[in-house]
C-alpha cells in the first residue's frame, strides 16, 4: 500500500486530502503543526525517517496575508524554509514530493491567465515567502511537483465563503470588492487534482475551479445559492481599504492540468455542492 504523508493535515485542504486519500486506498500519515514543525529540520527529519512515506504532500503554510506582513520571520520560516526542509528530507528518503503554492507569487497586474512558466513577481510578504519556498524546492530537487491554487475554501477552514455566511447572520448588507478577479477553488476539487497528479510527471501545475469572477460576484453567488437576502454592495479596492495589497488579477492558466487530462468544473457548480454539503451537515 502506498504511504502518503500530509503536512498541514489540520487545515481545510489537509483535511480533505486525508479524507480522499483514505477513500482511494492510500495509507495516510496525517501530521498537524502540533505533531511536526516544518520549520524545524530535526522535527521534519525525525518524522520522515520514522514514517518512511512514498509520497509527501506539503499543504502546511502560513496563509494569513495581513499577518504575514506583521510576522515576517514566521512567514519566511514556514512558507520558505519549511518548504525547503520538507523537500530536502523527502529527497533524502526517496519520496515523491508535492508542494502547494499560490497565485500570490505573481504580481496580480496581468490581463491573461497566468501560465505555469510566467515570471514570478510577488508584491506581499505572503507571496514573497511562497516564492522563496518554490525557489528552494527547485534548488533541492528537479523531481518535485508544485501546485499553485487560488481563492481556496472548504470544510473545516476559515475562508471567504464562511466569512460571508457568518457576516450575513447579523448584517443586512455587505461591502465586497468588485475589481479583484480570480477563480475560487473548492478543496474537494483541489484535493482530487492533487491525487491525480501523483501519476503525472513532476513540474508546475495550476489548479483552480474553471470560470472567473470578482469577489463581489462570488459573494453574490454565495447569498443566492444559500437563499439569503443580505445585500452585497460593490466597492473598489481603494474604497474598501485593505491594509495589505491584494492582486487585482489572480486567474491561473489550466494548460498543464488540461494536458494531464484534468478539467476542473465551474466554480459556481463547486460552490453549490459545498453549500449543500454544509447545509446537510448542519441538519
Swiss-Prot record:
InterPro entries associated with the record: dTDP_dehydrorham_reduct, NAD(P)-bd_dom_sf, RmlD-like-bd
Domain of life: Bacteria
GO molecular function, one term: dTDP-4-dehydrorhamnose reductase activity
A matching Pfam family: RmlD_sub_bind
Repressor keyword on record: no
Keyword field contains Amino-acid biosynthesis: no
Keywords: NADP, Oxidoreductase
Biological processes annotated in GO: dTDP-rhamnose biosynthetic process; polysaccharide biosynthetic process
A single Gene Ontology CC term: cytosol
Gene3D superfamilies linked: NAD(P)-binding Rossmann-like Domain (3.40.50.720), UDP-galactose 4-epimerase, domain 1 (3.90.25.10)
Pathway stated in the Swiss-Prot or TrEMBL entry: Spore coat biogenesis; spore coat polysaccharide biosynthesis
Family to which this protein belongs: Belongs to the dTDP-4-dehydrorhamnose reductase family.
Protein name: Spore coat polysaccharide biosynthesis protein SpsK
